């Protein structure tokens, strides 16, 4: 209950017994033993739905991300309504969605990555995605995706996908760089009139091709060693034969 009050005539006004608030209902938070303190159980975004409080594992940023704001390492989904500047690094255990333009940054997503305005990599950018990648465009970027890749265009990028690589939209083009699509590559325009070297590889993962090249090199080295051993044995046999003839 509250405290008694006094009216303008000095008469006491008795306090009414207050009505306790019902406990909060929802998810994503813990309640103290006395029921008076609520603490978030996870990092994320608070939303209110009528009489329910829900903390979602989402980090939402309404501006740009750069070296000044600091890098991001989050256990859920990350949504950025601005751009991501050069030198920034964003890592999310789940999906990443970026509305603005990305420039020379590093992005790591445990699920999907959505780049609504593409990536200007400047040779500094790297993308690592466990799910699928959706991008408007990519330039001068290293890309590793476990799922499929869907974009409008790629210029001088190294793209590796364990699934299919699909280029559609206005340009639907690959110009320069290397693109590996284990399950196939769909593209309308490959290379350009300037004869920029453009490589596409279908059916074999880049890492497997590298491993095969390493094994082939190892075989060549072993063969050279074997040839040297055989030449040495032959030389010894000749020396032993000459010694026997002299006896």
Where are the language model's segments positioned?
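Charge-rich, low-hydrophobicity low-complexity segments
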Residues: 1-146, 152, 178, 189, ...
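Long, internal scaffold/assembly segments composed of regular secondary structure
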Residues: 155-160, 169-184, 191
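Phosphate-interacting basic helix/loop segments used at nucleotide- and nucleic-acid interfaces
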Residues: 165-167
């Amino acid at each position: 209950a509250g405290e008694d009050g006094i009216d303008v005539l000095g008469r006491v006004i008795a306090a009414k017994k207050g009505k306790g608030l019902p406990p909060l209902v929802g998810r994503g938070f813990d309640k103290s033993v006395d029921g008076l303190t609520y603490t978030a159980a996870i990092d994320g975004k608070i939303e209110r739905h009528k009489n329910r409080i829900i903390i979602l594992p989402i980090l939402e940023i309404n501006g740009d991300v750069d070296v000044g704001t600091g890098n991001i390492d989050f256990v859920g989904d990350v949504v950025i309504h601005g751009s991501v500047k050069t030198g920034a690094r964003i890592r999310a255990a789940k999906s990443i969605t970026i509305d603005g333009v990305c420039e020379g940054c590093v992005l790591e997503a445990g699920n999907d990555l959505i780049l609504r305005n593409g990536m200007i990599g400047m040779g500094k950018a790297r993308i690592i995605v466990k799910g699928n990648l959706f991008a408007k465009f990519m330039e001068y970027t290293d890309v590793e995706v476990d799922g499929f890749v869907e974009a409008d265009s790629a210029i001088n990028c190294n793209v590796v996908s364990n699934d299919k690589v699909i280029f559609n939209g206005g340009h639907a083009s690959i110009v320069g760089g290397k693109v590996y699509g284990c399950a196939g590559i769909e593209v309308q325009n490959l290379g350009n009139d300037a004869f920029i070297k453009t490589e596409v590889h279908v059916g074999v993962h880049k890492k497997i091709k590298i491993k095969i090249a390493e094994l082939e090199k190892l075989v060549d080295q072993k063969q050279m060693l074997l040839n040297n051993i055989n030449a040495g044995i032959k030389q010894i046999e000749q020396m032993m034969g000459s010694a026997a003839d002299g006896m």
